[in-house]
Amino acid sequence: MPSMLERISKNLVKEIGSKDLTPVKYLLSATKLRQFVILRKKKDSRSSFWEQSDYVPVEFSLNDILEPSSSVLETVVTGPFHFSDIMIQKHKADMGVNVGIEVSVSGEASVDHGCSLEFQIVTIPSPNLEDFQKRKLLDPEPSFLKECRRRGDNLYVVTEAVELINNTVLYDSSSVNILGKIALWITYGKGQGQGESLRVKKKALTLQKGMVMAYKRKQLVIKEKAILISDDDEQRTFQDEYEISEMVGYCAARSEGLLPSFHTISPTLFNASSNDMKLKPELFLTQQFLSGHLPKYEQVHILPVGRIEEPFWQNFKHLQEEVFQKIKTLAQLSKDVQDVMFYSILAMLRDRGALQDLMNMLELDSSGHLDGPGGAILKKLQQDSNHAWFNPKDPILYLLEAIMVLSDFQHDLLACSMEKRILLQQQELVRSILEPNFRYPWSIPFTLKPELLAPLQSEGLAITYGLLEECGLRMELDNPRSTWDVEAKMPLSALYGTLSLLQQLAEA
C-alpha cells in the first residue's frame, strides 16, 4: 500500500500527464531533490525477491564534480498550478441469519483522504545541459565519485522538478462502525442483546514549501574527464566497467547454457585481466565457472530437453533458503556484535538517511568514520575478530536492503515490534500468508490461522496488521480474512526477510 506522500505524488503525475516524471515515495527524498542534484541507483539487489528501484539523492550536484564556470545557469519555471485530490468512500452492509438464534449485523465503513496544494514545474533547458557537458571533471576526481565507481553505481541528474509553492498538509482517515444484535428463544421467553464497535484511524503529514513531489532525470555518463548527460538509461555511468551483456551475442553460438539474468562484471572480480575477458569471454560464461562465482540463487540450471523447472521466483522455498543462508552467516557473529546490531538498527529505524549512510559505508568496505548507531555497528565489526573466515557485511547489507524496501510507517511499526519482542510471531504469520500464495499472480481469499493471531494480543495484532496493510493487503482487526494481491508479494518478501534476520539478532 503506498504511503500518503507516494499516493498523492502518483496522482499529481497522472494529472500533469508526463510519463517521464517519477513520483517521490519518501519524505527524505522530497527534502533533498533539486535541479542538478545527482541521483544514485544501486546496480543489483542482494535478493532475488525484491529490488531497490528508488533513485537515492546524494549530497552532491553537478557543480560539485565539475570545474568551476563563470556562466550563470538559468531554469525555466512553469506555474503556479493548483491541485486538489480528495477521495471519500462509504460502504454499508446488512446481514441477518435465523437458525434457532436470530442474528443481525450491520456495518458502515468510510475512507477519507486527500490534500490541496500549489506547485510549479522547474526545468533545465537543453542549452544549459550542453554548457555542463563542455566542462571537465575536477582533478583529482571527487572522493564520492570514486566510491560510486567502486560500488558500480549508475548516476543520474535531476533535470526537472515539481516543487511545492506553499506548505501542504496531507490527511488520511478511516472509520468502521459495526452494530450487532442477537435474539435467543428460551423456555420462558426471548432473550436479546446487542453491541456496537467503532474504530477510527487518522494520519496527517505536513510537507514544507520547496519540497519536490516528482522529478525527471537523465543518465550521467563519465568517460575519462568528460561527461555526457544522456536520455539513454541503458548506458553505464562509468564506461570502464565491463558488461557481461556485451559478451552474450559472441558466446551464443558456443554455449548451450542460458543465463537467467545479465550481470555487470568487473575484470578484477574473478582475478582475471580485462584482456582475458575480451579475448576469451566464453571461458567466463560456462556453467561450471558461474556455479563457483555466482550466489546459489542466481546459478544457472540447465535441464534436459522436455523438462520444465518452475521459476525460482515463484517458489517460496527459494526465498526461505535465501533467508536461511543469511541467518546462518549472521549467527556466526559474536553475541556482542549481534546485540549492538539489534539495538543500533532499532535506534535508526526512524531515520532512513542513517540507514542509507550505513549501507554506503558497508558497500565501500570502508573503515571511514560514521557517527551515531551506524558508527557503533562499524566499530564493533572492526573490533570483533571472530569473522576472519567469512564476510559479515553480506547478511547485514541484506537485512538493511530488506528494511529499505519497506515504508517509513513500517519502520515505525518495526521499531514497536522489536521493543515488544513479537518478531517471531509476526514472522510465522507472514510465512503463513506467503507460503500457500507465493506462486499465484491472481487474487485469492485467505484466512489467518487463529493460533498464529492469539499470541500477538490486541496491541501486537494492531502493529502486525499495520505492517501487512502497508504491504498492500486489506486487513481489519475484527476479521482474519483477506485477499492475496500479487503486488504485495515483494514488500511481504522483504518483510519476511527483515523479521527473520531481526529475530536472529534478538535471540542471540
UniProtKB/Swiss-Prot annotation:
Domain free text: Intramolecular interactions between N- and C-terminal domains are important for autoinhibition in the absence of activation signal. The intrinsic pyroptosis-inducing activity is carried by the N-terminal domain.
UniProt keyword Transmembrane, yes or no: yes
Record PTM: Cleavage by CASP8 relieves autoinhibition by releasing the N-terminal moiety (Gasdermin-C, N-terminal) that initiates pyroptosis. The cleavage site is unclear. According to a publication, it takes place after Asp-240 in response to alpha-ketoglutarate. Another paper reports cleavage by CASP8 after Asp-365.
Family, as annotated: Belongs to the gasdermin family.
GO biological process, any: pyroptotic inflammatory response
Keyword line: Cell membrane, Cytoplasm, Lipoprotein, Membrane, Necrosis, Palmitate, Transmembrane, Transmembrane beta strand
One GO cellular component term: cytosol
Full protein name: Gasdermin-C
Induction or repression: Expression in induced by STAT3 and CD274/PD-L1 in response to hypoxia.
GO MF term set: phosphatidylinositol-4,5-bisphosphate binding; phosphatidylinositol-4-phosphate binding; phosphatidylserine binding
InterPro entries membership: Gasdermin (IPR007677), Gasdermin_pore (IPR040460), Gasdermin_PUB (IPR041263)
Residues that span the membrane, as ranges: none
Effect caused by changing residue 319 to D: Low spontaneous pyroptosis-inducing activity
Tissue: Expressed mainly in trachea and spleen. In the esophagus, expressed in differentiating cells and probably in differentiated cells. Also detected in gastric epithelium.
Pfam families registered for this protein in UniProt: Gasdermin, Gasdermin_C
Region entry Triggers pyroptosis, spans: 1-257
Site (Cleavage): 240-241, 365-366
PANTHER family assigned to the protein according to its UniProt record, in alphabetical order: GASDERMIN, GASDERMIN-C
Outcome after substituting residue 276 to A: Does not affect cleavage by CASP8 in response to alpha-ketoglutarate
Origin organism lineage: Eukaryota, Metazoa, Chordata, Craniata, Vertebrata
Lineage top rank: taxon: Eukaryota
